[in-house]
């Protein structure tokens, strides 16, 4: 499991990156979600890595 937290605002970013944040379930700064570690989730994380913080959750 991965614990993903949004640490930067999506204002002014590329619309595709905003959609990726929505796809991950993130809506605002400080919001945290838990996701299963899959290749598709990893790809989404790599796209918006500059706006999120990722920690491994056991």
From Swiss-Prot:
<dbReference type="InterPro" id="IPR018038">
    <property type="entry name" value="Ribosomal_uL30_CS"/>
</dbReference>
<dbReference type="Pfam" id="PF00327">
    <property type="entry name" value="Ribosomal_L30"/>
</dbReference>
<dbReference type="InterPro" id="IPR016082">
    <property type="entry name" value="Ribosomal_uL30_ferredoxin-like"/>
</dbReference>
<keyword id="KW-0687">Ribonucleoprotein</keyword>
<comment type="subunit">
    <text>Part of the 50S ribosomal subunit.</text>
</comment>
<dbReference type="GO" id="GO:0006412">
    <property type="term" value="P:translation"/>
</dbReference>
<dbReference type="GO" id="GO:0003735">
    <property type="term" value="F:structural constituent of ribosome"/>
</dbReference>
<keyword id="KW-0689">Ribosomal protein</keyword>
<dbReference type="GO" id="GO:0022625">
    <property type="term" value="C:cytosolic large ribosomal subunit"/>
</dbReference>
<comment type="similarity">
    <text>Belongs to the universal ribosomal protein uL30 family.</text>
</comment>
<dbReference type="InterPro" id="IPR005996">
    <property type="entry name" value="Ribosomal_uL30_bac-type"/>
</dbReference>
<dbReference type="InterPro" id="IPR036919">
    <property type="entry name" value="Ribo_uL30_ferredoxin-like_sf"/>
</dbReference>
<protein>
    <recommendedName>
        <fullName>Large ribosomal subunit protein uL30</fullName>
    </recommendedName>
</protein>
